[in-house]
């Protein structure tokens, strides 16, 4: 009786030469990492909130700590949910959570509401980072997976200087009341573009 040979997707992916498809996956993930800078912008918007009298030492510490707590939780559950739903679905889900919390947070009426939104942002961001790296490395061949991961991390780390430059440009142009709100809306809009690209071009991981 003839045996049916099961496909070995991982081995086939590893045998693929570097090609345009790998570059496309790199571009989508790198852009997604670059623009999800809700964490990077935290200190910048705190400066504006302090000028408005929204925050003191206690609320500043809470604002920062609650974001980190959310990221811890997101990192913990993000991979688990991604294992059950798939990398692509998890990518889009966590982007949606992250974007929605940034938009809602941008229209916060007070500091307590904003802090609550920051927790949700942290959850979405923590889960998103886990899923992006997990999905990306599953596409890349084993022979140079570390190289591809270094490249995508390099692009993602530019989010910190980029959002700082944007904040510098905004400060003389708009009031503090709108400055911090716009600084949350910009990454939300850019992340929406990243989500649309993922929806259109990001396939499910064959390894999953």
Give the residues covered by each predicted segment.
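Transmembrane-helix signature of 12-pass secondary carriers
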Residues: 1-208
């Amino acid at each position: 009786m003839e045996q049916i040979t099961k496909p070995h997707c991982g081995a086939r992916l590893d045998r693929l030469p570097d090609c345009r498809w790998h570059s496309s996956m790199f571009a989508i993930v790198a852009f997604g990492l670059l623009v999800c800078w809700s964490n990077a912008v935290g200190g910048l918007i705190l400066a504006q909130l302090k000028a408005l009298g929204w925050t003191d030492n206690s609320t500043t510490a809470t604002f920062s700590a609650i974001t980190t707590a959310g990221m811890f939780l997101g990192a913990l559950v993000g991979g688990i949910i991604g294992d059950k739903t798939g990398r692509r679905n998890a990518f889009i889900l966590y982007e949606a959570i992250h974007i929605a919390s940034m938009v809602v947070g941008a229209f916060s009426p007070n500091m307590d509401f904003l802090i609550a939104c920051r927790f949700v942002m942290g959850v979405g961001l923590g889960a998103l980072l886990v899923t992006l790296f997990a999905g990306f490395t599953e596409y890349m061949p084993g022979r140079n997976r570390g190289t591809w991961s270094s490249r995508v991390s390099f692009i993602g780390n530019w989010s910190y200087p980029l959002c700082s430059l944007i904040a510098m440009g905004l400060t003389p142009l708009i009031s503090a009341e709108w400055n911090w709100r716009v600084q949350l809306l910009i990454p939300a809009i850019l992340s929406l573009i990243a989500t649309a690209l993922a929806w259109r071009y990001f396939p499910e991981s064959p390894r999953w």
